[in-house]
């Protein structure tokens, strides 16, 4: 595995997709402190201020294109389990995979199923004989609050973790 940590990039996905096109080996991970052009599924904007975890992974799985939906599920479940392990016990059951590409926080007392808060977005892009797996996790709130559009109200992992 090769980890590259960058300060500020347009998109970690674009860096990994370029590496895929160049024939780079599986295992490259690109992480950025901030992204100016982060995006999710169907080109939706992923706000990426300092305080989150934004990374992309280069994979070359030995599966047919139809197997990518299974890969998406496996990645989603792995991220969900990792976030649950970091959360206080009372918050763990509320961290859920929202198919096909989100990890959300939906406590039992949530009045409606569509009133969840978004913890993480995951994207899968086939490119250059491989797959770019993009993961964006809301860890800490930004220093300057950002306006929230649509239903993607963020939930920050720091609020669900033990302090100290």
Give short role names for the model-derived ranges.
Residues 1-88, 109-114:
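N-terminal lobe of the biotin/lipoate ligase/transferase fold
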Residues 63-65, 69-95, 105-164:
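Long, positively charged amphipathic alpha-helical accessory segments at protein N-termini or as interdomain linkers
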């Amino acid at each position: 595995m090769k980890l590259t940590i960058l300060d500020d990039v347009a998109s970690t996905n674009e860096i990994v997709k370029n590496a895929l096109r160049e024939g780079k080996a599986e295992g490259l991970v690109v992480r950025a402190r901030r992204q100016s052009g982060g995006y999710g599924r169907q080109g939706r904007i992923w706000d990426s201020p300092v305080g989150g975890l934004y990374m992309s992974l280069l994979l070359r799985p030995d599966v047919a294109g139809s197997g990518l939906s299974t890969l998406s599920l496996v990645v989603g479940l792995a991220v969900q389990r990792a976030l649950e392990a970091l959360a206080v016990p009372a918050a763990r059951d509320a961290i859920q995979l929202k198919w096909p590409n989100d990890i959300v926080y939906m406590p039992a007392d949530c009045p409606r199923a569509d009133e969840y808060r978004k913890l993480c977005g995951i994207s899968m892009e086939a490119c250059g004989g491989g797959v770019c797996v993009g993961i964006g996790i809301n860890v800490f709130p930004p220093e300057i609050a950002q306006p929230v559009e649509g239903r993607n109200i963020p939930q920050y992992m720091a609020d669900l973790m033990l302090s100290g």
